[in-house]
Amino acid sequence: MVSVIVPVYNLEKYITATLDSITSQGIPDMEVLLVDDKSTDSSVAVINDYIASHPDSGIRLIEPDGKLKACGARNLGIRESRGRYIAFLDGDDLWMKDKLDHQLAFMEEKGCGFSFTGYEFADETAKPMGKVVRVPETITYARALRNTTIFTSTVIFDTEIVKKEDIVFPDILSEDTALWFSLLRKGYKACGLDENLTLYRRTGNSLSSDKKDAARRIWNLYRRSEHLSLPRSVFSFIGWGFNAVKRRI
């Protein structure tokens, strides 16, 4: 079984298209866990309408009592998941046709428990912007420090290889990048499928849209989370900055 985890917060304009991109994957044994983080718009109503019109889709809406933020929403989804494979998709991003089939076959071929794919930037209307981010066949911890090319909405874990208790998003800024660093430090192998299989929708609410904030977050990860020395932090940061610009040119 594949468990797809989708954190939701005020995504009434986007969540239907995201769900369409999941249900059109054609995976028979799949559950979709939508974790709403106290949305103040009509996201919950839109989701409930979608579930009612797609009764056999395996979609389940989880509404926790308190506010969790993206990290907590994903962690709750992980705890609730029943599948061998855990996939992530943000509630405003989209998967390409057959994304799951291609990636699962790739993971089986490579014997890999942690995989990610290429992706393309899209505008707020989900129109592709023609900029595809290529990914390496494998990525090490040292390489990830300089080029955080792993995009959350492309990631799948095989929990028979990567321990479920190791898949925990920390409650810090850039929690996804922090998790990739943690797993790579522990020796898990991350494999990249260099196919454009996801659309990364750039909305006004994108947490990572502010370049200065992104730079500040990655620097704080180096120094406070990874405890890198100052020289290694500077070296990694220069590489990160170069690659971040290149991804957007």
Where are these regions (language model features)?
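Conserved nucleotide-sugar donor-binding catalytic segment
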Residues: V6, R79, V135-D213, R217
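Short aromatic/hydrophobic "clamp" motif used to bind/position activated sugar donors
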Residues: I86
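Acidic helix N-cap motif at the loop->helix transition within catalytic regions
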Residues: Y14-T16, D41-Y50, L94, D98
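Glycine-rich, basic loop-to-helix element that forms the pyrophosphate-binding segment
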Residues: P64-S81, H102
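Short, well-formed alpha-helical segments that are part of the catalytic scaffolds
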Residues: L11-S24
